[in-house]
Amino acid sequence: MPGRERRDGGRSADKNDNNKGRNDRGRNDRNNRRGRGRDDDRNQYIERVVTINRVSKVVKGGRRFSFTALVIVGDGQGMVGVGYGKAKEVPAAIQKGAEEARKNFFRVPMIAGTITHPVQGEAAAGIVMLRPAAPGTGVIAGGATRPVLECAGIQDVLSKSLGSDNAINVVHATVDALKQLVRPEEVAARRGKSVEEVTPTRMLRARAGQGA
């Protein structure tokens, strides 16, 4: 009869089917939770694809094509990273670039939405100059510099590209400039002065209003 044990100690088919169904549902629930966790981590970051290129490799049988993607990822609150992905398909290249960008995260010092002091970054032939700006100025930047600044959460800044227009060089020059930024406390400690002596009055007022 259904639901009863057989004399040889085995269980009837309907019980085995029920147990299998419960196990499958449990595995599916766990997989769904893992998938939601990955989606939540991905959604909390800002992603910008700067450039996608098709590259080829000459092999014995002909040419093999693949794609490269330069991706910027940031949380919009001071954390930003740059990644370069390569794959046979565009979505896979973008995903690899985003994963590498998360591994390369670094913190950008800011005061009231702008950078702490003027700075110039260089990478190969790319040269990018950044200057602090008053509230309401916005991000005055173009080309490949803008997505880096926006992903970092910088709201007011002046920038100028002085070298190569190559997107990869410009992005890495911008990153080099941002990595050179230091907080006023670090400058004061290095010079043996107070924070008020090394920080412009406008930034001190903005910092006081920010509650930093």
From Swiss-Prot:
It comes from the Bacteria. Residues 1-42 are annotated as: Disordered. One of its GO terms (molecular function) is structural constituent of ribosome. InterPro entries: Ribosomal_Su5_D2-typ_SF, Ribosomal_uS5, Ribosomal_uS5_bac-type, Ribosomal_uS5_C, Ribosomal_uS5_N, Ribosomal_uS5_N_CS, Ribsml_uS5_D2-typ_fold_subgr. It comes from Corynebacterium kroppenstedtii (strain DSM 44385 / JCM 11950 / CIP 105744 / CCUG 35717). This is Small ribosomal subunit protein uS5. Belongs to the universal ribosomal protein uS5 family. The N-terminal domain interacts with the head of the 30S subunit; the C-terminal domain interacts with the body and contacts protein S4. The interaction surface between S4 and S5 is involved in control of translational fidelity. PANTHER family: MITOCHONDRIAL RIBOSOMAL PROTEIN S5. The gene is rpsE. Keywords: Ribonucleoprotein, Ribosomal protein, RNA-binding, rRNA-binding.
